[in-house]
Amino acid sequence: MPPRRSHKKSRNGCDQCKERRVKCDEKHPICSNCTSRELTCTYLKIPIVSAPGRTAHAVTDRSPDPPHQGQSQLKNQNKQPMSSVVSAEPSFVLRDLELMHKFSTDTFRCLCGDQSDMDDWQVLIPQQASKHTFLLHGILALASLHIAATATETTHVLSYLDTALQYYNMSFVPFRQALGALTPVNCDAVFAQSAIITVIGIALPRLNAQHRGECFSMIENMVSVFELLQGSTKVSRISRPWLKASMFSKYDFWMIETGDLDSEELVAIEKLSRLTTCIDDAEHGSANREAIDLLRSCFAKFARSSHPVAILAWLVYTKKEFIDGLRMRQPVPLLILMHWGVLLNELGSHFWWAMGCGRDLVTELLAEIKSEDPVWEQALEWPRKMIGV
């Protein structure tokens, strides 16, 4: 009988694997077993470990302490028994606690249209995140992005941007899996995550490029956001009966009441519509006209509710053929996107994540669309005026 293969035993597995009595790979912040099962992964029951020659490891992403402070702490630690100082690193590390606190006390507001939304995003959505890993990662990514957007020291900005990118990327696979398996149990979490990735998708690449001195195109970024949200129409279509009885019933774009467009908005949309009609595009014409009709609804609904859903829903419901036209830089889809950029610019005066995005988008599109045709020039006048260039 061959000898048994030796293996290193460990008592440092996560709480969930211990309860299930399965081998834990001890990955941080979330082990592979909990990732695949979409469980909240915790290491709260790890025993205190005494190890000769090891020093205490405080898990924190804050700036290092001043030399004299760190030396003082080290002296105090050396006076204590090693077993009282050294402990295994927790899965839910201090930065994660900081980010969850940031979201539940501040960041949640950037997803609210009015006071009636507050309790949903501050309390109920974090509760949902405890059951769905993709939503937990989305919340942590958005909170980290919020800190990066308001930080002043470059090292802090880049550190929190890295954390935001990490959690943003980690949320994709389980989110896509949930999109493909919608149920009344997970539809709230999927809907919430759709809103979160829209906000992050608009703001994160732009902020990251600015602080790293990289080239960036707001047009390309918006195409990426469109593609990112292509599966989200399924959320609205399939889960609408479930959402009617949930916290998200009031966020249904089609149920938002419409207001009256002002005279300039009416004229601008009519010019856009006439221009699109004059250009015979058999492949994309129908998608372009639908995008304009939807845009008109967005203007009307935002005039009544001022809720971000009234604007962001346009990214979800536009057709694939319209997005293809944007990707190929066709003038008409670009012009339609420019008019939506005016609405995005309006959001920038209310929400930190949209600040400057609409202006950058319209400015870039004005440089992209060049025409000496008077009809085109007239269509460009209103967006140019609205952002002040």
Where are the language model's segments positioned?
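Intrinsically disordered, low-complexity acidic/Ser/Thr-rich segments used as protein-protein interaction/activation
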Residues: 3, 20-21, 37-39, 46-276, ...
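Extracellular structured ligand-interaction cores
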Residues: 28, 188-190, 335
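Short helix-capping and inter-helix turn/linker motifs at the boundaries of alpha-helical repeat units
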Residues: 4-11, 115-116, 312-316
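C-terminal effector modules of eukaryotic transcription factors
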Residues: 127, 220-389
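Residues within alpha-helical segments
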Residues: 18, 35, 140, 144, ...
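N-terminal cysteine-rich, zinc-dependent DNA-binding domains of eukaryotic transcription factors
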Residues: 1-49
